[in-house]
Amino acid sequence: MSLTSVLWNFVAKLAVDHGLNTNPDQVFQTVENVGKSFEKYETSFLKSLFNGNLGLSLPSAINILTLIIVLYFSLVIVNKTTSIALALFKTLAVISFFLLIGCLFAYWFINNGSF
């Protein structure tokens, strides 16, 4: 069992425990589907990044920054971290957000060529 499937099962159990849905099977099925699609994306992107096949281009920077922001919001939702770790991730997420906006603007400008 991979780490992401464990994480998605944990998220589903939290959702059911907090009464977000009266049908637990539906929650588990939805979370499982989202987890599988995220795991496919994550493994292919990270494998190519670690193997050096994926150069640090604008789209890969956008992917990395998006993963950092998603990690921060998942920590905020779960709220099981210490205040120091949450403050560090908040700073990292804010920096990532502004870099993401800059990268998206640069990517759009490069592809369109003008305002």
From Swiss-Prot:
Family stated for the protein in its record: Belongs to the APQ12 family.
Bilayer-spanning residue ranges: 58-78, 91-111
Chief place where the protein resides: nucleus
Keywords attached to this entry: Endoplasmic reticulum, Membrane, mRNA transport, Nucleus, Transmembrane, Transmembrane helix, Transport
GO cellular component: endoplasmic reticulum; endoplasmic reticulum membrane; mitotic nuclear bridge midzone membrane domain; nuclear envelope; nuclear membrane; nuclear outer membrane-endoplasmic reticulum membrane network; perinuclear endoplasmic reticulum
Upper taxonomic lineage: Eukaryota, Fungi, Dikarya, Ascomycota, Taphrinomycotina
Membrane topology: Multi-pass membrane protein
Pfam families: Apq12
Compartments in which it is found: Nucleus membrane; Endoplasmic reticulum membrane
Identification of the protein by name: Nuclear membrane organization protein apq12
Function statement: Involved in the regulation of lipid homeostasis in the endoplasmic reticulum, thereby impacting nuclear pore complex biogenesis and localization, and nucleocytoplasmic mRNA transport.
InterPro entries assigned: APQ12 (IPR024316)
